[in-house]
Amino acid sequence: MNEKARLLRIRAKLKRKKPRFLRQEWWRYPKFKNDPKWRRPKGIDSKMRLKKKGKPRSPSIGWSSPKAVRGLHPSGYEEVLVHNVKELEAIDPTRQAARIAGTVGARKREMILARAKELGVKVLNP
């Protein structure tokens, strides 16, 4: 069994259990509901800061994924954003995969896809 594949399976299992980390009392104010993101609770009497039972969870180092596979695509490849054919040719097909930028048009996208097939580079959004 490949070590990288094993760590990717562990990461997937950890991600299923990980809660959504949202700011304190995000349900109370509409301005927080529309833009959910983490902000550390800093209030002097904050139950969430004190990690009281029944209060939302806070992010900590224990929730992180294994360091060797952190930031990788679920397929195990490192993502590289590609804007043109020249950038595609710099990719190592054994450990990197291309993601074509959203600003690339249809004609250039076809050129990139054709060249990727020749080079054997995996494209994540064909």
UniProtKB/Swiss-Prot annotation:
GO molecular function, one term: structural constituent of ribosome
InterPro entries: Ribosomal_eL32, Ribosomal_eL32_arc, Ribosomal_eL32_CS, Ribosomal_eL32_sf
Lineage start: Archaea, Methanobacteriati, Methanobacteriota, Thermococci, Thermococcales
Keywords for the protein's UniProt record, in alphabetical order: Ribonucleoprotein, Ribosomal protein
NCBIfam families the UniProt entry points to: PRK08562.1
One Gene Ontology CC term in the entry: cytosolic large ribosomal subunit
Pfam families (alphabetical): Ribosomal_L32e
SUPFAM superfamilies registered for this protein in UniProt: Ribosomal protein L32e
Quaternary organization: Part of the 50S ribosomal subunit.
Annotated S-S bridges: none
Similarity comment text for this entry: Belongs to the eukaryotic ribosomal protein eL32 family.
Species, as recorded: Thermococcus kodakarensis (strain ATCC BAA-918 / JCM 12380 / KOD1) (Pyrococcus kodakaraensis (strain KOD1))
Protein name: Large ribosomal subunit protein eL32
Gene Ontology biological process terms, A to Z: translation
Ribosomal protein keyword on record: yes
SMART domains: Ribosomal_L32e
